[in-house]
């Protein structure tokens, strides 16, 4: 049996997550254009050029040092001049409110969410859900 396109793209997001050096949470994201083309990927990790030290990936330091997968995806697309307008973003975990803001501002039209879980407060996700709904960004499980 052949996998569906959504399964295929979520597989890319999971593959991107495998690049994360975070010992407890690996998140990946992939932006797919309206014609099914992959436009950008991202995973949670240190910013480009920042020294990669293991202690920076441990709690609570990682909250100060790391960027979320969705933030890295948006930043990488901007860095190389790729528009995310109208894209679907496949992400392994539900976006937090900060990442929701970035995705909305980048013009993403749909979020496809994997089954990953995090220890972030529930209010993060509730706020993100409201922002997605109010801004017209569709969310699919």
PLM ranges: what are they?
Residues 1-141:
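Zinc-dependent deaminase catalytic domain
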């Amino acid at each position: 049996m052949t996998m569906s396109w959504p399964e295929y793209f979520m597989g890319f997001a999971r593959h991107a997550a495998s690049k994360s050096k975070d010992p407890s949470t690996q998140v990946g994201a992939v932006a797919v254009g309206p014609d099914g083309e992959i436009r950008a990927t991202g995973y949670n990790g240190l910013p480009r050029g920042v020294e990669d030290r293991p202690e920076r990936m441990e709690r609570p330091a990682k909250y100060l040092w790391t960027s979320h997968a969705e933030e890295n995806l948006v930043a990488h697309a901007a860095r190389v001049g790729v528009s995310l307008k109208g894209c679907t973003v496949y992400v392994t975990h539900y976006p937090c409110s900060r990442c929701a803001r970035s995705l909305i501002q980048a013009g993403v039209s749909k979020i496809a969410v994997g089954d990953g879980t995090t220890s972030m407060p529930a209010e993060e996700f509730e706020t993100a859900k409201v922002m997605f709904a109010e801004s017209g960004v569709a969310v699919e499980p």
